[in-house]
Curated annotation (Swiss-Prot):
Main location: membrane
Taxonomy of the source species: Bacteria, Pseudomonadati, Pseudomonadota, Alphaproteobacteria, Candidatus Pelagibacterales
Family indicated by similarity: Belongs to the ATPase A chain family.
Oligomeric form and interacting partners: F-type ATPases have 2 components, CF(1) - the catalytic core - and CF(0) - the membrane proton channel. CF(1) has five subunits: alpha(3), beta(3), gamma(1), delta(1), epsilon(1). CF(0) has three main subunits: a(1), b(2) and c(9-12). The alpha and beta chains form an alternating ring which encloses part of the gamma chain. CF(1) is attached to CF(0) by a central stalk formed by the gamma and epsilon chains, while a peripheral stalk is formed by the delta and b chains.
Xref: SUPFAM superfamilies: F1F0 ATP synthase subunit A (SSF81336)
Superkingdom assignment: Bacteria
Name listed for the protein in its UniProt record: ATP synthase subunit a
Keywords for this protein: ATP synthesis, Cell inner membrane, Cell membrane, CF(0), Hydrogen ion transport, Ion transport, Membrane, Transmembrane, Transmembrane helix, Transport
Keyword Zinc tagged: no
Coiled-coil region(s): none
Length: 244
């Protein structure tokens, strides 16, 4: 194999080393692609909203489809009460989607293939949703951990399970995204290495697999952004509408 498939996930510094005390806050390739993803989102929606016409341009159509898609996802999952949080969900979905998609470009860096990035995103969502829950319901939000209709003898055990399940949300949310992106890109690199190693004659089969895997990985990149956003909507729904 030409190169180690894990080298693509290496974070390296761009420019001078910058430290805040003992903490290294240098600009890295991960930082670069987060900035690129954010700027690309701003550029597309800025161009898409410049001229609102009955016959939309490609950028306007993309902007409107994205807006409608996320708006419907929020309505179907969290209801009308979640509408004030549209910008929050929309920003998360688009950021994860663009980070995933930029990772499909050769020699680009997949930001979401690092657990620290996905865990910080998931933790931010977890803390934000928890704050919203307590702001809306006060201490009544704790009823989320007490399901109705549970026999008194089982209640202590069920409450413990519910608390553990709740606290594990940022872990499951972050690991799901990180694991899928890392696994997919590793497989693509492995098959790409086979193509190079086997040459023109023997490389046709792994090349075919590599092309098919690339198409699948593009689909996975979108689906993982969708799953990340829709789970955020579900958590927000729990905070806004106590079903227990």
């Amino acid at each position: 194999m030409a190169t180690n498939p894990m080298n693509q996930f290496e974070v390296y510094r761009i420019g001078p080393e910058i430290k805040l005390g003992a903490i290294d806050i240098s600009f890295t390739n991960a930082s670069l692609f987060m900035v690129i993803s954010s700027l690309a989102i701003l550029l597309i929606f800025n161009l898409g909203s410049k001229k609102n016409s009955l016959l939309p341009s490609k950028m306007q159509l993309l902007s409107e489809l994205s807006y409608t898609f996320v708006s419907k996802m929020i309505s179907d999952t969290a209801g009308s009460k979640a509408k004030p949080y549209f910008a929050f969900i929309f920003s998360i979905f688009m950021f994860v989607l663009f980070c995933n998609m930029f990772g499909m470009i050769p020699y680009a860096f997949t930001v979401t293939s690092h657990i620290i990035v996905t865990f910080i995103l998931a933790s931010f969502i977890f803390v934000g949703v928890t704050i919203i829950g307590f702001m809306k319901h006060g201490l009544g939000y704790l009823k989320l951990f007490v399901p109705s209709g549970v026999p008194a003898v089982l209640l202590p055990l069920i409450v413990v399970i519910e608390i553990i399940s709740y606290l594990s949300r940022p872990v499951s949310l972050s690991v799901r995204l990180f694991a899928n992106m890392m696994a997919g890109h590793t497989m693509m690199k492995v098959f790409g290495g086979f193509v190079i190693s086997l040459g023109i004659v023997g490389g046709w089969l792994p090349l075919s697999f590599s092309v098919a895997l690339t198409g699948l990985e593009i689909l996975v990149a979108f689906l993982q952004a969708y799953v990340f956003a829709i789970l955020t909507c579900i958590y927000l729904n729990d905070a806004l509408n106590l079903h227990h």
